[in-house]
């Protein structure tokens, strides 16, 4: 492990310290390492051809005109990416779905965009993790 010195603005250092405390880091180095890993993983998952895993979560209105069938159709068109799907009834009108995906990150992003763009889908979020060799 290498020791490095960095210079931060006072406001940025204050934000780092606050983040470190909220997340329970023992020191700034641990926080900075995690932030850097997260940034590198995000960049890696945005490159077409990168293999990885992802979690797609979204809320949708199940009574919205043909929305459930459109989502299922989209899932079937991308069946090769799907590892598992969890379906939760939030209330009478809304459902939460969480899909675990695996494959080319470009294809995963395309699938997520197709689902999230459907009218009636809300709170769509894709969390990607590059596959580590």
Swiss-Prot record:
Please give the subunit comment from the record: Homotetramer.
Q: Which GO terms describe its biological process?
A: negative regulation of DNA-templated transcription initiation; regulation of DNA-templated transcription; response to nickel cation
GO cellular component terms listed in the entry, alphabetical order = protein-DNA complex; transcription regulator complex
In Swiss-Prot or TrEMBL terms, this protein is called Nickel-responsive regulator
Q: Where does Ni(2+) bind?
A: 76, 87, 89, 95
- Keywords assigned by UniProt, alphabetized: DNA-binding, Metal-binding, Nickel, Repressor, Transcription, Transcription regulation
The role this protein plays is: Transcriptional repressor of the nikABCDE operon. Is active in the presence of excessive concentrations of intracellular nickel.
Family indicated by similarity = Belongs to the transcriptional regulatory CopG/NikR family.
What cofactor does this protein call for? Ni(2+)
Q: Which CDD domains match?
A: RHH_NikR_HicB-like
Q: From the UniProt record, which GO molecular function terms apply?
A: core promoter sequence-specific DNA binding; DNA binding; DNA-binding transcription repressor activity; identical protein binding; nickel cation binding; sequence-specific DNA binding; transcription cis-regulatory region binding
Taxonomically, which superkingdom?
Bacteria
Family matches, as InterPro entries: Acetolactate_synth/TF_NikR_C (IPR027271), ACT-like_dom_sf (IPR045865), Arc_rbn_hlx_hlx (IPR013321), CopG (IPR002145), CopG/NikR_regulator (IPR050192), Ni_resp_reg_NikR (IPR022988), Nickel_NikR_proteobac (IPR014160), Ribbon_hlx_hlx (IPR010985)
